[in-house]
Regions:
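Substrate-binding groove/exosite segments of carbohydrate-active enzymes
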Residues: 1-93, 123, 135
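The feature captures the catalytic groove of carbohydrate-active enzymes
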Residues: 27, 32-44, 77-170, 174-203
Length: 203
């Protein structure tokens, strides 16, 4: 399984069934056997949080709490405060902390141009996204993970962690907007202004 598929299936499953164990089982399996996309590692927080919101059962949060923390990917933050998978921060210790063998990399959307039967110039689902060292999509998921970890910590009564993640998410939101929002054009760009002015807009 893949985290992104598990997240979609989880929310669909909640809409048609009264028993939510399948989604939780997939989530707990993926915590031990994660897949390669950066954003999907971050989506572990979404899956965990939605499991709690829909069931009110905090047991999975409790047992997975220490596994969830490194999946916020704070270890990949550079000096500018943004996360990146391409600037040399994927150490052996980091990869062990997320239970992954190999290097993770940003996906944005799938499939990319020219693969899985698409012609070399035939567009995929990433809408010509301009990949840089600091990608807006990846950093948006990082912000979401911080907010969700704040909620998870609150559900478990870990007030010191609540305060920490609340502070981190507030500061990161400001940094994110300052880094990626083009005030003149009125939209978020794919990466930092120094790297690209391209924006993959979805209408």
């Amino acid at each position: 399984p893949y985290e992104a598929d598990a997240l979609i299936n989880q929310l669909c499953h909640y809409g048609v069934d009264r028993e939510y164990a399948i989604a939780r089982r997939s989530h707990e399996y993926l915590l031990q056997h994660p897949t390669w996309p950066t954003e999907w590692i971050l989506q572990a927080l979404s899956i965990a949080w939605y499991d709690y919101l829909y069931t009110g059962d905090s047991r999975s949060l409790e047992s997975s709490y220490e596994l969830l923390k490194p999946r916020i990917l704070m270890a990949l933050r550079e000096k500018n405060g943004l996360i990146s998978t391409t600037t040399g921060l994927q150490t052996d210790d980091f990869l062990r902390s997320i239970r992954f063998k190999g290097q993770i990399r940003d996906i944005v959307d799938w499939p990319h141009t020219g693969i899985l039967g698409l012609g070399k110039k035939q567009g995929g689902e990433d809408d010509g996204f301009a990949f840089t060292d600091y990608n807006v999509v990846t950093n948006a998921w990082h912000y979401a993970a911080l907010k969700q970890m704040e909620g998870i910590a609150g559900a478990l009564g870990k007030q010191d962690d609540v305060a920490f993640y609340a502070s981190e998410s507030d500061a990161f939101k400001k940094r994110f907007i300052r880094s990626f929002f083009d005030v003149r054009k009125g939209y978020f760009t794919d990466g930092l202004a120094a790297d690209t002015d391209h924006a993959s807009l979805h209408g």
